[in-house]
Amino acid sequence: MQTRNAFSWIKKEITRSISVLLMIYIITRAPISNAYPIFAQQGYENPREATGRIVCANCHLANKPVDIEVPQAVLPDTVFEAVVRIPYDMQVKQVLANGKKGALNVGAVLILPEGFELAPPHRLSPQIKEKIGNLSFQSYRPTKKNILVIGPVPGKKYSEITFPILSPDPATKRDVYFLKYPLYVGGNRGRGQIYPDGSKSNNNVSNATATGVVKQIIRKEKGGYEITIVDASDGSEVIDIIPPGPELLVSEGESIKLDQPLTSNPNVGGFGQGDAEIVLQDPLRVQGLLLFLASIILAQILLVLKKKQFEKVQLSEMNF
């Protein structure tokens, strides 16, 4: 009996260990591109604050342009393109987490009106599929299908991102109406300056934490510096740690002031946000407009014909 219980316990432990190892494998093997949008998704219920500011700006501090292009109007239950452009100088390199230089990535968040959502694959035309390429979009929340995120993806290939959007049909969704709706977009290029926990990344300027004289600068084996400053007020020593990446601007023996930049600003990226408007057009209204225009054209034609007929009658009476 004890042997059977021991065997059962060993079997359970092996099963549990395999499950844990499998979970670790899945987590560690997950593409890094899936991790970045989670920073905002985990910290904010809605990516757009009440002030209109998109929360990505809390980590990407530099202000850069972004542009969105959508049709002026769309019909219900149709697929259309929302094109987001994130321009930047393709020649520049950014500081990576290990201090080395690398290419910039881009990412975007698109906030659609309620009812609008990502178009399903079977509704996409070959032209749209070609524009999308290998991009993988995801909803900000399972319950918020109208908010889409993408990135980071290589900026050189995807500085222009095409979102395939499916418009809602008021006939099947009672909370959707034929109106003009706003859309909001945020786009970033490059790494952020602040991590979600509030700590700084190495994509920042490092400032002096004391006024005094630089006593010693030690270059670390894995990159970065350790700067010893002799405080001018009490002679104590203050050590500032510089992460790998930024270029050092000070030297030993140099007098510095509190908050003086010790390094250059390595950031070459930034975040921008914009908006656009789109009209969900009623097909009956379009048909009515076409009929109205057709009736006007027909009336004009009849008027011209009537005028010519009247002129012929007048001419015949004069000849008589």
Swiss-Prot record:
Cellular location(s): Plastid, Chloroplast thylakoid membrane
Gene3D superfamilies per UniProt: 2.40.50.100, Cytochrome f large domain, Single helix bin
Cleavable signal peptide: 1-35
Gene that this sequence comes from: petA
Cellular component GO terms, alphabetical: chloroplast thylakoid membrane
The protein's name in its UniProt record: Cytochrome f
A single MF term (Gene Ontology): iron ion binding
Key words of the record: Chloroplast, Electron transport, Heme, Iron, Membrane, Metal-binding, Photosynthesis, Plastid, Signal, Thylakoid, Transmembrane, Transmembrane helix, Transport
Topology class, membrane: Single-pass membrane protein
Membrane-spanning parts: 286-305
Cofactor note: Binds 1 heme group covalently.
Family indicated by similarity: Belongs to the cytochrome f family.
Keyword Iron tagged: yes
Cofactor: heme
Organism for this UniProt entry: Pisum sativum
Self-association state and partner proteins as the record states: The 4 large subunits of the cytochrome b6-f complex are cytochrome b6, subunit IV (17 kDa polypeptide, petD), cytochrome f and the Rieske protein, while the 4 small subunits are PetG, PetL, PetM and PetN. The complex functions as a dimer.
Pfam families: Apocytochr_F_C (PF01333), Apocytochr_F_N (PF16639)
The keyword Translocase is annotated on this UniProt entry: no
One biological process term in Gene Ontology: photosynthesis
InterPro entries assigned to the protein according to its UniProt record, in alphabetical order: Cyt-f_TM (IPR024058), Cyt_f (IPR002325), Cyt_f_lg_dom (IPR024094), Cyt_f_lg_dom_sf (IPR036826), Rudment_hybrid_motif (IPR011054)
